[in-house]
Amino acid sequence: MLKLVILCFALFYNTVSSTRFLFGVEVKCDFDEVFQLTVSHWEDDGNTFWDRDEDITGRMTMFARKKIFFYQDGHHGFEFGKLEPYGWFLHNCTKNGNFREYRHGLSSTSGSNGLEYIEYTMSEFLKIVRANKKSDRKLDKTYLWESYLHQFEKGKTSFIPVEAFNRNLTVNFNECVKEGVIFETVVHDYDKNCDSIQVRWFARIEKVCGYRVLAQFIGADTKFWLNILSDDMFGLANAAMSDPNMDKIVYAPPLAINEEYQNDMVNYVNNCIDGEIVGQTSLSPKFDEGKALLSKHRFKVGQRLELLNYSNSTEIRVARIQEICGRRMNVSITKKDFPESLPDADDDRQVFSSGSQYWIDEGSFFIFPVGFAAVNGYQLNAKKEYIEHTNKIAQAIKNGENPRYDSDDVTFDQLAKDPIDPMIWRKVKVGQKFELIDPLAQQFNNLHVASILKFCKTEGYLIVGMDGPDALEDSFPIHINNTFMFPVGYAEKYNLELVPPDEFKGTFRWDEYLEKESAETLPLDLFKPMPSQERLDKFKVGLRLEAADMCENQFICPATVKSVHGRLINVNFDGWDEEFDELYDVDSHDILPIGWCEAHSYVLQPPKKYNY
């Protein structure tokens, strides 16, 4: 292997080392005000092509202040050395607003043309090699976390760690990916000169931010950000297992190796392997096996299930799975299953159309197995054939028999919930009160007074509604193990707004209301147990995440924790006013670590004030 490494490195070094890496910086701002900064990365092979966008190999846009400076070390000629760092600016940070262009070296960090500079260095940000390689032009507009990741390197921002969230992948990688772990990764220095051979080297994880890791090549100073779910990250010895003859995969270090080893590759490789890899914690083959399982889903496109009508929650309709993205599914009502003319898709987001997007997690309270409505006597809007089919399923379940499903039915087993302790379940009574985040609302920033209205026949399911004259009309079925129900007094204890029943007059007090209604509270042991304090402490104000908008559930947005209220976090969508903030339980599947969208080829919406 050693000979192969040296030969490969020598071959590529002679052809690639003359490339210089340059940064062009475009600045647009008002004088002395916050500006938008776009950094474009060219590979300069000796030609000058500042105006050709097709030659840009990477671009990053951020908001900053004008006292900033970018530079990049590189190689010049056929000898290792440092290219003189410089900055190339086009800006209008002048009193008269005229554009000014200049080139400035880093011999000093003081001014040129009347401006002062601070030095700003950053690691390489690798474009994601997506686990889902499906080409999609809409992904060109997805938001990336580049600027915040580089802020993290400077200690200026932080992210909620993956282990704090409820399960959001079909495979759990929390125990695999940790600081200090060594893995194999693709070295892209050689991409242009190697069409059929993949070049890899070893790297160590320095920091973990959601599904992004900051890593450093073994034996080099180069650091880079990589998504752990990309096709560029492998367990140690993956190359030997996947390509035993090493015909298509070779090991070679990055071009920017430490200077002391540039002329002594034998010692370089030996020191890397013996001194920094042998005996260290490495990414195991289970990591690669887990990634392979990500493409295997519990459900399949075309399956049918039952979907709660979000605009009429007393009704269930038949829906089909249109797309699957990890745990999330795009489901819609189709003409194939609807007994009448389909409602207008502009008025009903659950109705199928060419651009319909109704994305929910596979654990969403909105979906039920085929036969749920029939088993529980819930209003079902479906074709006659489907109603007859599900009545047979309900009868079989009642008789203790195995139902006969169609091949495309989502079954009760596929959407099974955790069993409920019978002793605890006996404590539940119709009329018991609790506090509720209305999952059918247009705003998710308060709790409501609510009651249990009736029991479903399916174990663990209840019909609940918010107290008031429209309680039955606005009621809906929900499993007791959910992220929307909270015990009486929760809002007051954690400083949240509690909305009293409609038409309630005066100041609402729980003790007075319970006495007036001759009602009791839902016992505490019926609610989800409070997470450990250790886990809750991982949700801190200012930490960043990705969050699905519960009003427009096709949108996943960059977001920030604004406040913490027990097991509820108040999330602000970056760039949006606080009136659009939403409350999420820490167990919600609608909050995600950063990098989730990137790894699943799902568009992460840019912040509202972010100019793309």
Swiss-Prot record:
GO function terms (MF aspect): chromatin binding; histone binding
GO BP, one annotated term: negative regulation of DNA-templated transcription
Mutagenesis / variant outcome for changing F368S: In allele lin-61(n3736); reduces binding to histone H3 trimethylated at 'Lys-9'; multivulva phenotype in combination with lin56(n2728)
GO CC annotation, single: chromatin
Keyword Repeat part of the UniProt annotation: yes
SUPFAM superfamilies to which the protein is assigned, alphabetical: Tudor/PWWP/MBT (SSF63748)
Keyword line: Chromosome, Nucleus, Repeat
MBT repeat segments: 143-249, 263-380, 381-501, 508-607
InterPro entries in UniProt: Mbt, PcG_chromatin_remod_factors
Subcellular location: Nucleus; Chromosome
Summary of the knockout phenotype: Multivulva phenotype in combination with loss of function of class A synMuv genes lin-8, lin-38, lin-56 and lin15A and with the class B synMuv gene hpl-2. Reduction of brood size and defects in the development of germ cells. Loss of function results in suppression of mat-3(ku233) mutant vulval phenotype.
Top-level division of the source organism's lineage: Eukaryota
Sections of the chain in a coiled coil: none
Impact when changing P253S: In allele lin-61(n3624); does not affect binding to histone H3 trimethylated at 'Lys-9'; multivulva phenotype in combination with lin56(n2728)
Biological function: Synthetic multivulva class B (synMuvB) protein required to repress the induction of vulval development by Ras signaling. Unlike other synMuv proteins it does not associate with the multiprotein DRM complex and the NuRD-like complex. Interaction with methylated histone H3 is essential for vulva development. It has a role in maintaining genome stability.
Domain note: The MBT repeats specifically recognize and bind histone H3 di- and tri-methylated at 'Lys-9' (H3K9me2/3).
Quaternary organization: Interacts preferentially with histone H3 that is dimethylated or trimethylated at 'Lys-9'.
Protein known as: Protein lin-61
Organism: Caenorhabditis elegans
Gene this chain is encoded by: lin-61
